[in-house]
Amino acid sequence: MKVILLERVEGTGVLGDVVTVKDGFARNFLLPRHKALRANSANLKSFEVQRAEIEARNVKNREAAGKSGEGLDGKQYVMIRQAGESGQLYGSVAGRDVADAIKAEGGKVDRSMIVLDKPIKTLGVHEVKVKLHAEVTVTVTLNIARSQDEADRQARGENVVAAQFEEDRAAEAEAASDMAAGGAGSFEGDHYES
């Protein structure tokens, strides 16, 4: 299906381009979201008449997105989640969770603006892209931890899961050396009289 793009669509074209796309893409994505018009003669004439207005509106929206993006770009958000000892989350962090964390601190984003290739399933510091406009994308940092103390340690660059693993290993080694030093089967106070 031939369509006229009303804004920049990644991988398809920019404002004003007449492009041929698959029918499903046009019907299910571009047309319902007002990102394109069917490329018939009436719409082509109408678009040419309104082109300056549409371009001005697009520039205005891009500038507004750029201003809101200045406050978000590079900002770090802490998310406290439950996780196992290996650092694997019980559940995952999806786009909705990221949007909620940003909104909680005063950001104006929608979950459809969050760009995640796949849900986040591990503790640590993760970078996430937020697409505020077709031409404005910012990066925010998510610090996912089990507690605020852990989040602070991760923010300083410490790998909390590796540190926990080393602490556990040291404790096991100490317990093993205590057992070896005490001797097997000689426990004081285990004397029973009959």
Swiss-Prot record:
Q: Does the keyword Plastid apply?
A: no
GO BP terms: namely: translation
GO molecular-function term, one example from the UniProt record: rRNA binding
Question: Which keywords annotate this record?
Answer: Ribonucleoprotein, Ribosomal protein, RNA-binding, rRNA-binding
Q: Name one GO cellular component term.
A: ribonucleoprotein complex
Could you tell me which residues belong to the region Disordered?
A: 167-194
Q: Which cysteines in this chain are paired by disulphide bridges? A: none
Keyword Ribonucleoprotein appears in the UniProt entry: yes
What this protein is reported to do is described as: Binds to the 23S rRNA.
Similarity comment: family membership: Belongs to the bacterial ribosomal protein bL9 family.
Query: This protein is called what?
Result: Large ribosomal subunit protein bL9
Task: State the species of origin.
Answer: Caulobacter sp. (strain K31)
